[in-house]
Amino acid sequence: MIIDRLPSSLKNMLTYAVSIFLVKGISLIMLPIMAQFLSPAQLGKLELLATTTVFLSLLVGLAMHENLYRFVGELKCKVEQFNKVSELYTYAVMLSLMVGSIVTIVLFLLPPLQSVFTALDIALLCTVLGFESALGISMAWLRFKDRASSFLVISVVSTVFQVSAILIVLYIAPVVTYIYAVGVLTGLLQLVILHKTNGFTWSWGGMRNLKKLLMYSFPLMLSTLVAFGLTGAEKWIIGYSFSIETLGLYAVAAKFALAMCILIQPFSMWWMPKRFNALLYQGKEYTARVTQCGFVYIAILAISAASVSQLFITWALPSDYFPAVELLTGVIVVALFKELSDLFNIGILQQKKTQLLLVINVVCTLGGLGLCLTLSSYGIWGIIGSIAFAQGSRAAILLYFSQRLVKLPFQFTALLLILVNTLGCLALGFIYTHPVWLILITLFGAIFNLAIAYRYEFLSVFNLPRFSSDLQRTVRGS
């Protein structure tokens, strides 16, 4: 079979695709069902709770998983790799418990927070803070070792548990707190399974080693927190400036942008842990070509997600959620630029210039939030437009400085053609919403981007099997 002849990298990406769709796509899978039981206001509160959890998890986690990509990834000896990641895992658990305890005390002492969330909500949130960093390192280690099949099994088990529990909650007591609790329990289940699967040993590498790791990851954590202002904080602004119902509609649109990001993750999960190793041992040409393939993949997904999402909302959700269609194009553009920022940010991280990354994120985030305040009088589109502009600026600035530090041989003419075509298709999809037009726009956009990639030989890096030769052999054999 042709699939058996695919490179192992592509096989792993396909396996990761299924795994990530199961783990992170569950919210989208369950959306039609949840929309029948929950109002936009309830979905808005659930989104607010999830957003706060993500922010605090970033704070408490100290970006310790980034050390795996940077330091473990450069080691050749497998024993050294395992010893290093065991030290990293131990550090992550201890730091999460220490910092998480402090954050927990602060949260329970904040009266404004208690007016929005219940005490049980806060307790569940604090539970997540204690294990999220260790969970991230455990999952990253499986990807680093290319144990895609183990990753898939864990994903299936956790998804079955989560879906079953959510359905029970929806039919018995459709309360936001209980739905959130299911997610927390699922995370704990994953951590237990992963701890046994990876077999990490408790290993303390000393304060000097910890200081070295934190010097690298702490600026990244700050940078990520600042960047959160463009990838999550807008939900706080929407909930405060407009209404919790409006936030619920925005959350529905954002779930489809998340779906696009989920479909990008198989490539990211395969490539991100290996990019520095590839740059070091396989060269700039290989690194640039793989990155360009990722760009094409992201662009095609953006066009497809914008069209499919419009059809899904109008066909599968109650009429109360139809206004979310008008927000789809904006949130897809935001997600597009955010993913491109992560994809092209190679040189800055490779040269360990995390302070520079922090400065860039601070400038772009402050500019974006300033625009949000200035343009909020134009409604929710003023906020979406501000975030999209800030994300696009951030992507361009990161690419510029990354190239100055490590100049990769990107084919910028081809990349610009693909970007212009992608943004044009997204604009057309916003104007022409009839299903036939959406399908035609999607097909044209995908074919054009693939044609450019073929013309500039982006895909040659993967050594794909020659399907035409397979077809000829099949015909001769018959």
Q: In which residue ranges do the predicted regions lie?
A:
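Membrane-proximal transmembrane or re-entrant/amphipathic helices at the cytosolic face
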Residues: 2-3, 429-478
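Helix-loop junctions and terminal segments of transmembrane helices
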Residues: 60-77, 257-295, 345-350
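Hydrophobic transmembrane helix module of multi-pass membrane transport proteins
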Residues: 90-224
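Signature of the first transmembrane helix
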Residues: 8-65, 163, 218-244, 442-446
